[in-house]
């Protein structure tokens, strides 16, 4: 892929386009050993060697991060008042976003990327990608609950969830631990 050198360097997190142009004016940027002059030079991301301050800057089109989202962090790209999952990734170079959502008080594995096609293929209902959750509950779950979830639970008067799979892995008098596999992801469906 061919890009202008200013876009290439801005995409890789070296600074804004205006910052990059200042670096170029100072002679800090080289393409295949030759100093860039204008910021408009084209770079082939597959074969050209770009140096900034004599350090290589490799072009990475897509970024992928798996994070363990802690409780108290929201599944968003930005928020003025609350830390986000994107805030947790200091080394991200491009506009990354969470694939899916976990509630603020929920913790768990979350994919962060800038690969829109992958996100679409994982989230689009027509793609039928299951989502599996580990859940700890107050109260005892039993085989009746397993059957109810398998038939599709009525979440509220306007919505009945698609059939899902509930696997109880441990239960006591006042708690249960289980896995639930959903075929769709609706607001607070697991709660």
Which role does the model predict for each range below?
Residues 2-191:
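Basic, flexible Lys/Arg- and Gly-enriched helix-loop patches that mediate nucleic-acid binding at interfaces
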